C-alpha cells in the first residue's frame, strides 16, 4: 500500500460520519462537534464564510490515505487537526521571539503550520485513527513528513505540534533522528530523499494539574495538606459561604441556552476589563451546548442576598468545564463583579469536588498560574514538537530549547517543593515533577 497526505480547508470536507469512524478517544476537543463549532461559530476561518473572518487560523486538516494497487479507492487511515497560522495568538506555546528573530534577519516566520486544537492548551491525542499502536506511530510520522513537504512546497517557516499526548509525542520524538526513517515510514520518497534534512525539536512547558488519590470528599483531600495551608483554603471557602454565595453545578441538558448567554456575558466582560476580547463567540458556545452537552460542566456562583440588585438574574460568575471519562478540563471563566477568592472557588475547588464526586482521576485547570500550587495542583510537564525549515534557524532554536528544557525541569522541581502537602502525603520522589504524557 502506498500512503499519501492531502489537505482540506474545512472539517466539513471530511464529514462527521468519516470523523466518527476514525475517532478513538473521548477527548472533547477532538470531537467533530467541537472543531466544527470553531468554524461555524466564526472563531476561525472557513471557506463557507461570506465575509472572510481573517482570524489568522485557517483550517488545513491533514488526511493520511492508503492506496492499494488493485483499487482506485483511497482508504483514510488517519486525520490530524492542522491549521495555517498568520500569527501566534491562541497557541500557548510561545514562539514570538522566534518570529522576531526571523524579522530581524529579513525573513518571514508566518505563515506556519500548527498541529493542535485552536485556543486549547491541553494535552491530548493529535491524530484520529483506528490503527493499532505500531500503525499509529507510523501514521504520526507520515503525517509529519506530509507537513514537512507541504511547508517546503508552500514556503512556510515550519510546523509545530502542540500539547501532544504520550502516543503522539513519542512518535514525533523519533523524528529528532532523521536516520530513523526507513521504507515503512516513508510516503513516496526513498530514505535518501527524506524531507527531514534536519531534525524535529522537542520543547517542554510546565502547567499545574490535580490528581485524584481516591479521595472521598474535599475534607479528605485537605487532610493531605499541612495545617496552615488547610486552614487557608477552609477560610477562603468559608468566607464566600458566610457571605451568602450559592454554587450550582450543571451538566449536560441541565445547562440551558439562557445559562450559556449569562456565562458568555461574564466571559467577555472579564476580557473587556483587560481591554481584550475572548477568542470564542456566543455562537460557538451555543453550538457545543446543542451538539455535545454530555461533555460540559457549568459552575455558577449566585449573588449573596445582600448584594442582589433589581436585576432578577443573580448569577455573578460562571466557569465552563469540559470532561471525559478520566479527565476534567477547566477552560473558560467570567464574572460580573470581583469577590475575594471567587475565582478559586469556581475554577478550582468546585472542579476538585466534581472530580471526587464522580471518580475522575485528573483535572487540568488551564495553563499558567502559580497560585494553583498552594491549592494542591502539581507541576506537570507538557510537550510540543517543532520542525523549522531554515537550517541555521533550526540549529539556533534547537540550542535554545536544550537550555530552556533544563530551566523548565528545574522550575518544575522547585515548584513541587512549594506544594502544600504534609510529609506523609509526599511522593517517594518529591522532587520529580509529574509528566503529563504519562497520565
Question: Can you annotate each of these PLM segments?
Answer:
Residues 1-439:
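N-acyltransferase acceptor-side catalytic subdomain
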Amino acid at each position: 500500500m502506498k500512503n499519501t497526505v492531502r489537505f482540506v480547508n474545512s472539517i466539513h470536507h471530511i464529514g462527521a460520519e468519516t470523523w466518527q469512524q476514525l475517532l478513538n478517544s473521548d477527548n472533547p476537543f477532538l470531537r467533530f462537534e467541537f472543531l466544527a463549532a470553531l468554524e461555524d461559530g466564526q472563531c476561525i476561518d472557513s471557506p463557507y464564510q461570506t465575509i472572510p473572518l481573517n482570524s489568522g487560523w485557517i483550517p488545513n486538516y491533514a488526511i493520511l490515505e492508503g492506496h492499494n494497487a488493485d483499487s482506485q479507492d483511497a482508504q483514510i487511515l488517519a486525520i490530524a487537526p492542522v491549521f495555517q497560522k498568520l500569527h501566534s495568538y491562541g497557541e500557548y506555546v510561545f514562539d514570538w521571539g522566534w518570529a522576531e528573530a526571523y524579522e530581524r534577519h529579513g525573513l518571514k516566520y508566518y505563515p506556519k503550520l500548527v498541529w493542535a486544537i485552536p485556543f486549547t492548551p491541553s494535552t491530548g491525542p493529535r491524530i484520529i485513527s483506528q490503527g493499532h499502536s505500531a500503525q499509529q506511530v507510523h501514521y504520526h510520522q507520515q503525517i509529519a513528513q506530509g507537513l514537512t513537504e507541504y511547508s517546503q512546497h508552500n514556503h512556510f517557516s515550519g510546523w509545530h505540534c502542540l500539547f501532544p499526548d504520550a502516543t503522539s509525542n513519542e512518535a514525533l520524538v523519533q523524528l529528532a533522528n532523521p536516520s530513523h526513517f526507513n521504507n515503512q515510514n516513508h510516503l513516496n520518497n526513498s530514505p535518501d530523499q527524506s524531507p527531514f534534512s534536519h531534525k524535529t525539536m522537542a520543547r517542554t512547558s510546565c502547567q499545574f494539574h490535580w490528581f485524584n488519590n481516591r479521595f472521598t470528599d474535599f475534607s479528605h483531600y485537605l487532610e493531605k495538606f499541612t495545617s496552615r495551608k488547610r486552614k487557608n483554603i477552609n477560610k477562603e471557602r468559608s468566607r464566600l459561604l458566610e457571605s451568602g454565595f450559592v454554587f450550582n453545578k450543571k451538566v449536560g441538558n441541565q445547562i440551558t441556552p439562557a445559562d450559556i448567554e449569562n456565562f458568555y456575558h461574564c466571559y467577555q466582560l472579564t476580557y473587556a476589563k483587560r481591554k481584550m476580547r475572548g477568542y470564542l463567540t456566543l455562537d460557538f458556545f451555543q453550538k457545543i451546548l446543542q451538539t455535545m452537552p454530555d461533555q460540559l460542566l457549568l459552575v455558577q456562583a449566585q449573588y449573596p442576598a445582600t448584594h442582589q440588585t433589581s436585576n432578577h438574574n443573580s448569577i455573578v460568575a460562571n466557569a465552563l468545564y469540559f470532561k471525559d471519562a478520566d479527565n476534567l478540563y477547566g477552560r473558560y471563566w467570567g464574572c460580573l463583579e470581583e469577590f475575594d477568592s471567587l475565582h478559586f472557588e469556581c475554577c478550582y475547588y468546585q472542579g476538585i469536588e466534581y472530580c471526587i464526586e464522580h471518580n475522575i482521576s485528573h483535572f487540568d485547570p488551564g495553563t499558567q498560574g502559580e497560585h494553583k500550587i498552594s491549592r494542591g495542583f502539581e507541576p506537570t510537564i507538557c510537550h510540543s514538537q517543532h520542525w523549522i525549515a531554515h537550517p541555521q534557524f533550526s540549529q539556533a532554536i534547537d540550542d535554545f530549547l536544550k537550555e530552556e528544557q533544563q530551566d523548565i525541569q528545574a522550575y518544575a522541581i522547585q515548584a513541587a517543593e512549594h506544594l502544600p502537602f504534609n510529609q506523609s502525603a509526599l511522593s517517594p520522589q518529591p522532587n520529580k515533577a509529574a509528566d503529563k504524557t504519562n497520565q
